[in-house]
Design a protein with these regions (language model features):
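Conserved "right-hand" nucleotidyltransferase catalytic core of DNA-directed polymerases
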Residues: 1-82, 163-201, 206, 210-216, ...
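Residue-level signal for secondary-structure boundary elements
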Residues: 28-32, 92, 112-116, 134-138, ...
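Helical catalytic core of nucleic-acid polymerases
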Residues: 44-167, 174, 184
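Short acidic, glycine/serine/threonine-rich loops at helix termini
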Residues: 84-86, 220-223
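Short, low-order "capping/linker" segments at domain edges
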Residues: 222-231
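Charge-patterned, long linear interaction tracts outside catalytic cores
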Residues: 270-301
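Conserved small/polar residues in nucleotide/adenosyl-binding loops
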Residues: 302-309
């Protein structure tokens, strides 16, 4: 593995490079190396790097937009696939990398045109190709390219996050994940944020897709609900996402749906949890799904004079 030439290393703590340089030490076994984690803080945000990706979030964070401060989410479009094509990390077992580039290009054009069916279908093709790089039973297996995607992807985003934090006074990194960062700062500094992101895009070749967030309730990087300017709420995580998942009918979590409904209503609209629960007449919101076995052998049925008692 070779660090990218267009990486601005001055924004990345040297300890991060020391962590990844351990891969050159042949006395360290693969099992020990790839289980390793490196932790650091960017202001209030704890961040973890490793061989599975980067993630970080301010824990138990609740925030609402004010007239002076805002939150912006900067996500890289099809990040890992573009790392393959732009940085030359495509599997060396593909006869012609141009085939993969053409598929990715078609996917991005479909997304821009609003063709969700084509975009989502090709997204699966593009993203699973990265996973194949690290699957020894797949014909696309190429661990060098797979590790290169993962390491370089983390370093580019860490550089962007550190640059924003060091350059803009009072900025907070709210969240940092495998394909983007979320920042909170003064609205007067938005132009500086935009300039930093524009330079990063120009230098790396990646495209950032920006969203504005007016409210967020975040437990951690994997569990949060955010509200966009149009009032639409986006939730992630087992605490808040129930029912049939957008991914399809095979992704179903219909157990205790009322809990997620009540939590979202509280965080998004300020509705007391008790009000949401007591006003719900849909019995399926209250069902509990459990796997039969030694742990759940019996069921106690309780009935009361009134369904509200």
């Amino acid at each position: 593995y070779v660090y990218p030439d267009n990486l601005r290393k001055e924004y990345i703590p040297p300890e991060v490079f020391a962590f990844f340089d351990r891969m050159y030490d042949l006395s360290i076994s693969d099992s020990e190396l790839f289980k390793g984690k490196f932790n650091l803080n960017i202001g209030e945000c704890p961040v973890t790097l490793g061989y599975g990706g980067i993630h970080g979030a301010i824990p138990n964070f609740f925030w609402e937009e004010t007239k002076d401060r805002g939150i912006w989410n900067e996500d890289v479009g099809s990040y890992y696939p573009h790392l393959c094509t732009i940085n030359g990390y495509t599997s060396r077992n593909i006869p012609s990398p141009q085939i993969y580039e053409d598929i990715l290009d078609r996917r991005m054009k479909a997304k821009a045109a609003g063709d969700k069916h084509t975009a989502n279908a090709l997204k699966l093709v593009c993203n699973t190709t990265y996973g194949c790089l690290l699957n020894q039973y797949n014909d696309l297996y190429d661990p060098l390219m797979g590790r290169s995607v993962c390491i370089s992807g983390q370093l580019y985003l860490l550089e962007l996050a550190e640059h924003c934090y060091q350059e803009i006074e009072g900025l907070r990194i709210v969240q940092l994940n495998t394909d983007g960062i979320m920042v909170e700062c003064d609205k007067k500094d938005y132009d500086t944020l935009t300039a930093i992101c524009a330079e990063w895009q120009s230098r790396t070749g990646f495209d950032l897709e920006e969203d504005t967030v007016v409210k967020i309730a975040q437990k951690d990087v994997n569990n949060y609900v955010e509200v966009q300017p149009d009032g639409k709420a986006k939730a992630k995580g087992g605490y808040l996402v129930k029912g049939i998942a957008p991914a399809g009918a095979f992704n179903i979590n219909n157990s205790c749906v009322i809990v997620a409904t009540a939590l979202k209503e509280f965080f998004v609209n300020g509705t007391p949890v008790e009000d949401t629960i007591n006003s719900c007449d849909d019995i399926f919101q209250f069902q509990i799904i459990a796997k039969a076995g030694a742990k759940y052998r019996d069921c106690l049925l309780y009935t009361s004079p009134s369904p509200r008692d």
